């Protein structure tokens, strides 16, 4: 029986003849009992369903070689750790840190385990450490209305204060009328029994208040950083010993107080200078003949002496006012921004200059014939008397000529000759 020829078969099933040449088809001989050779199912892999040829070779992954230097170092450190463990007394080791005795731990794992134990020990101690609320007195601020500033300031630099006192100014003095921005309302948490017991013992005065810090460390920070300058006052933090402070008073900062005193003295001098100016002006208005004793009785000499004292005082003030006025006039003469530039002085309206004539007007004024017809000779209106009649006294030759032309020829309709006609037309 002739063999069966199959086309479109995989490459590994193509027929290879006795001459060693591969044919483009497969041949199935009767000896195979009518069954083809077993085929391996090729999975369609790769991008876009491309098939992977089984003939493609893949580079084998080389075996991982261990560095002999690292292996020797690990052996040395593991032996040293084993000797240390044998010499140390047997202690209870937590279950996660136990290892099987037949396995020798590496140096890196031992170092990591030791570092983890060392770092976890203080963290566990710190986590289980109980915080003790501590009471502190804040004293020295301006008044009870400014208590919020002291509490807010010390809470920021030291730590949380358990009391729910306000940390912001009153609502009426705020720009935004809201209670939600106050930390006393936004960052509150439940109090512990110890904190609640100390918070309930509230004590305060006009210039001091007792507060409770959540821990002794926060109280130590507040006392160590005391005093603090708050709104021009020195606010002290002291441990509460069961009694209020000896003095309930504000403690202003000396530097701020000195600056305020200097400022008040400056304002007093300015008021005195203003009073001297007004006093000198009053005396000048009274005149040189005005007698200061005219309004006083002459029964006693005390009044006269008082008048003399007031007169001498006024003279002294006048002298100081004159000196101050000279300095003020000298200061007002130059600009403040550019001291070398003098200020422009505004003259009164009466001293304003009239507009100067132009060059053409000056030439026309020198010519007699043309000068007759300018505004100075003709004027801006018909010259009339108070009764409305034509004023022959003040009228110039031009207006006299115009009156005759209007009277004889009626050139202007009688407007120049009769003023009543002008009023009727108006």
Swiss-Prot record:
UniProt keyword annotation of Repeat present: yes
Q: Could you tell me what this protein does?
A: Functions as a component of the nuclear pore complex (NPC). NPC components, collectively referred to as nucleoporins (NUPs), can play the role of both NPC structural components and of docking or interaction partners for transiently associated nuclear transport factors. Active directional transport is assured by both, a Phe-Gly (FG) repeat affinity gradient for these transport factors across the NPC and a transport cofactor concentration gradient across the nuclear envelope (GSP1 and GSP2 GTPases associated predominantly with GTP in the nucleus, with GDP in the cytoplasm).
What membrane topology is given?
A: Peripheral membrane protein
The entry describes its oligomerization and partners as: Component of the nuclear pore complex (NPC). NPC constitutes the exclusive means of nucleocytoplasmic transport. NPCs allow the passive diffusion of ions and small molecules and the active, nuclear transport receptor-mediated bidirectional transport of macromolecules such as proteins, RNAs, ribonucleoparticles (RNPs), and ribosomal subunits across the nuclear envelope. Due to its 8-fold rotational symmetry, all subunits are present with 8 copies or multiples thereof. Part of a tetrameric NUP192-NUP170-NIC96-NUP53 or NUP188-NUP170-NIC96-NUP53 module.
Q: What species is this protein from?
A: Chaetomium thermophilum (strain DSM 1495 / CBS 144.50 / IMI 039719) (Thermochaetoides thermophila)
Chain spans, region Disordered:
36-69, 84-129, 270-329
Question: What does UniProt give as GO cellular component?
Answer: nuclear membrane; nuclear pore
Provide the gene name from the record. Answer: NUP53
UniProt entry keywords in alphabetical sequence: Membrane, mRNA transport, Nuclear pore complex, Nucleus, Protein transport, Repeat, Translocation, Transport
Name of this chain's protein:
Nucleoporin NUP53
Q: Which Gene3D superfamilies does the entry mention?
A: 3.30.70.330
Chain positions of FG repeats? 48-49, 259-260, 412-414
Q: What is the lineage of its organism?
A: Eukaryota, Fungi, Dikarya, Ascomycota, Pezizomycotina
**GO BP annotation list:** mRNA transport; protein transport
**KW Transport (keyword) present:** yes
InterPro entries, A to Z:
Nucleotide-bd_a/b_plait_sf (IPR012677)
Predominant place of localization: nucleus
State the superkingdom. Eukaryota
Question: What remark about domains does the record contain?
Answer: Contains FG repeats. FG repeats are interaction sites for karyopherins (importins, exportins) and form probably an affinity gradient, guiding the transport proteins unidirectionally with their cargo through the NPC. FG repeat regions are highly flexible and lack ordered secondary structure. The overall conservation of FG repeats regarding exact sequence, spacing, and repeat unit length is limited. FG repeat types and their physico-chemical environment change across the NPC from the nucleoplasmic to the cytoplasmic side.
The UniProt regions of compositional bias labelled Polar residues, in chain numbering, are 84-93, 104-113, 270-283, 291-318
**Where in the cell is the protein located?**
Nucleus, Nuclear pore complex; Nucleus membrane
């Amino acid at each position: 029986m002739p063999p069966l020829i199959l086309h479109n078969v995989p490459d590994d099933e193509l027929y290879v003849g006795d001459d060693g040449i591969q044919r483009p088809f497969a041949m199935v001989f009767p000896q195979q009992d009518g069954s083809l050779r077993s085929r391996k199912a090729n999975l369609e892999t790769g991008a876009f369903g491309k098939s992977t040829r089984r003939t493609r070779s893949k580079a084998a992954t080389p075996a991982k070689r261990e560095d002999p230097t690292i292996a020797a170092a690990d052996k040395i450190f593991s032996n040293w750790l084993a000797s240390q463990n044998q010499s140390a007394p047997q202690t209870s080791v937590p279950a996660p840190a136990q290892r099987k005795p037949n396995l020798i731990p590496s140096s890196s794992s031992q170092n990591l385990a030791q570092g983890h134990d060392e770092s976890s020990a203080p963290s566990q101690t710190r986590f289980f450490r109980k915080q003790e609320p501590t009471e502190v007195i804040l004293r020295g601020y301006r008044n009870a209305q400014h208590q919020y500033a002291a509490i807010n300031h010390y809470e920021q630099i030291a730590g949380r204060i358990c009391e729910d006192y306000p940390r912001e100014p009153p609502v009426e003095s705020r720009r935004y009328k809201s209670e939600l921005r106050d930390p006393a309302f936004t960052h509150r948490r439940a109090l512990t029994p110890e904190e609640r017991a100390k918070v309930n013992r509230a004590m305060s005065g006009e210039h001091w208040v007792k507060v409770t810090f959540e821990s002794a460390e926060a109280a130590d920070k507040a006392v160590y950083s005391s005093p603090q300058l708050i709104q021009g006052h020195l606010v002290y933090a002291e441990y509460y010993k069961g009694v209020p402070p000896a003095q309930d008073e504000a403690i202003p900062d000396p530097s701020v107080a000195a600056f305020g005193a200097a400022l008040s003295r400056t304002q007093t001098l300015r008021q005195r200078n203003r009073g001297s100016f007004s006093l000198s002006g009053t005396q000048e208005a009274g005149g040189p003949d005005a007698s200061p004793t005219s309004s006083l009785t002459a029964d006693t000499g005390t009044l006269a002496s008082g008048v003399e004292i007031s007169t001498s005082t006024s003279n002294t003030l006048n002298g100081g006012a004159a000196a101050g006025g000279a300095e003020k006039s000298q200061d007002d003469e130059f600009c403040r921004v550019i001291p070398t530039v003098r200020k422009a002085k505004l003259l009164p309206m009466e001293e304003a200059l009239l507009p100067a004539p132009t060059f053409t007007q000056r030439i026309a004024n020198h010519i007699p014939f043309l000068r007759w017809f300018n505004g100075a000779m003709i004027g801006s209106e018909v010259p009339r008397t108070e009764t409305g009649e034509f004023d022959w006294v003040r009228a110039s030759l031009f207006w006299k000529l115009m009156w005759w032309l209007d009277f004889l020829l009626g050139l202007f309709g009688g407007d120049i000759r009769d003023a009543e006609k002008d009023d009727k037309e108006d």
